[in-house]
Every structure is written in C-alpha cells, then in structure tokens.
Amino acid sequence: MAELKLGYKASAEQFAPRELVELAVLAEAAGMDSATVSDHFQPWRHEGGHAPFSLAWMTAVGERTQRLVLGTSVLTPTFRYNPAVIAQAFATMGCLYPGRVFLGVGTGEALNEIATGYIGQWPEFKERFARLRESVKLMRELWLGDRVDFDGEYYKLRGASIYDVPEGGIPVYIAAGGPVVAKYAGRAGDGFICTSGKGEELYKDKLIPAVREGAEAAGRNAEDIDRMIEIKISYDPDPELALENTRFWAPLSLTPEQKHSIDDPIEMEKAADALPIEQVAKRWIVASDPDEAVEKVGQYVTWGLNHLVFHAPGHDQRRFLDLFKKDLEPRLRKLG
C-alpha cells in the first residue's frame, strides 16, 4: 500500500499573497506533508477574490519551510504559458528545494486563458488534452539537460537547453476528472490528482482502475504513482459555521461545462450565488465531529487514494489548521 500523506490546499482564489505564504508555513507546523496551490489568472469570484502567481508563492514558501513538498494543483502549461518556460521555472525550483517540488497539470479553463489573449473559440477537450500530452513530453525532454529539438503539432524547440536541472527531473502530477485522462496519468504521470465529493462510483470504479490500467499498459507499477485527492472539508465544532463556510466556494458546485467555459469571474460569481447553500455544501464533507469527519475522509483511502490534500473553505484558516492539528491529524494518521 502506498504511503499515506496529508497535505494543505492553499486557496489562492481566497487569500492575498502574504497571507497565503504564512498559511503554508502554519500548515507545516500543523503536521502537513505537502502544500499545493492553484494557478489562476482570475479567481472564481470577483468580490473578495484573489489570484496570486503560483510560482512566486512556491518560491516564497520554499524559503520559509523545511520539509513541505510544494506543487501546483493545477497549472495549465499549454496556453498562456510556453511549456519550455514552465520547464525552466520548475527546474530552478527543483534545484533550490531538492525533492520538494512537483508540477501538477491540467487541460485548462477558459476563465484563465481567454483574458490573457487566447484568440478564437475555446478548444474542445480533444485539443486541450493533446496540448497537455505534448507539453509534458516537451518538458520531460528539457529536464534531461540536453539540447532539444522538438517538432510538435503545437510547440516547437530549436537547440533549446535548460542549464540548471535537478537530478531526476521534476515529478509531474496529472489532474483527471474522468477515466481517459486518468489512464494517461497512469501511463505517463508520477502522480494523479482528482477532487472529492463526486460519488463513490467515480473513484472506485472509474478513476483508480483507469490509473492502474494506464500503468499496466506502460509496464509500470501502479503503486509507484502518488494518488492525490483534494478533500473538500469544512470541519468546525460549530455546525452552523461549518455549513456557512462553504458559501465562498459555491463556484465549485457549478457544472463542469460552466466551470470550463465561463471566462469572466463576475459571471462565474453570479451563476454560483444563484445556488442554494444545500447544493453548495454537497461538494464538501461538512462535519462538527472529528470522528465523523475522519470516517468520511477514510472512504477515499479505501477507494485507493493515498495523498489527501485538505481544502478548507472558511476565511479563518488559522482556526482550521489549529483544529486540524488537534482533532484531525492524529486520527487521520491511523488510516495509513
């Protein structure tokens, strides 16, 4: 069985840069093994939203912590970024913080790419997925430290080299919401990323089997693939506060089509605020009893996930981290 790891999701859409760094430092003190950050150019919400640059945050946190593994969850290396530049950035961080950096990638959302200059109709999944696969291949070639000529359908390199690369390159974690990309994660990823709250069948019968299938097809051991899940959890001894804290993150309860196609945070906020709190809370483990919270989290471990990254929705993250250290962390460690 893969090693159980506990992580903290730094909510870049909710907190300003300095606060987000301090929260990661506190997360290490609370016993977290990792800290991940999203890479949004625009937040899910216009009012009260934030969108600090993920790579600057990772470097700042790297300087302030000793053991936290840091990564994106997730970054899209295919539209507003050139994947060669992302490869260079992560190689530099890998040299600065050896063994503590990974690159989590996904196929992208219009919210972040249209505003930054993508021209034309937002691509369908087929093209976005093809771009992702090509970008990962390109970055891995650059991390070998050799001169690279790359002639892809979307990206090209001519005599390109990254001069400072960490030994072994950078682990790539691939985010998937369905079996097609999950199979690719098993075939080509060092890790796999998904999010909680979507029903047992998705994880137990689709995603994890697809990761294993992809690994087996590539002649790999599926147990070597870190299986990460963002656990949406609103835990507080005050049950009313635990429920109300989910409100800020109402956009997560929109349909996948809305989340991938709406390109304006103002419109995203309008659509999300039209949802009743009961629907918003369905995506979350809402609990005021620590045993109940850990029992619900434990289901994901039995379904095959081993790296649990906790995303708490409330504005008082210090309170959550204190409660995590006192109430949840000792119980969670027993799941391993």
From Swiss-Prot:
A single BP term in Gene Ontology: carbohydrate metabolic process
Catalyzed reaction equations: oxidized coenzyme F420-(gamma-L-Glu)(n) + D-glucose 6-phosphate + H(+) = 6-phospho-D-glucono-1,5-lactone + reduced coenzyme F420-(gamma-L-Glu)(n)
GO MF term list: coenzyme F420 binding; glucose-6-phosphate dehydrogenase (coenzyme F420) activity; oxidoreductase activity, acting on paired donors, with incorporation or reduction of molecular oxygen
Pfam families reported for this sequence: Bac_luciferase
Keywords: Carbohydrate metabolism, Oxidoreductase
CDD domains, per the entry: Tetrahydromethanopterin_reductase
Gene3D superfamilies with a match to the protein in the record: Luciferase-like domain
Keyword Lipid biosynthesis: no
Binding site residues for coenzyme F420-(gamma-Glu)n: D39, T76, T107, G108, N112, G177, G178, V180, V181
Domain of life: Bacteria
Subunit structure: Homodimer.
PANTHER family named in the record: 5,10-METHYLENETETRAHYDROMETHANOPTERIN REDUCTASE, PTHR43244
Function statement: Catalyzes the coenzyme F420-dependent oxidation of glucose 6-phosphate (G6P) to 6-phosphogluconolactone. Appears to have a role in resistance to oxidative stress, via its consumption of G6P that serves as a source of reducing power to combat oxidative stress in mycobacteria.
HAMAP family: F420_G6P_DH
Similarity comment: Belongs to the F420-dependent glucose-6-phosphate dehydrogenase family.
Protein name, entry field: F420-dependent glucose-6-phosphate dehydrogenase
Biological source species: Mycolicibacterium fortuitum (Mycobacterium fortuitum)
Phylogenetic lineage: Bacteria, Bacillati, Actinomycetota, Actinomycetes, Mycobacteriales
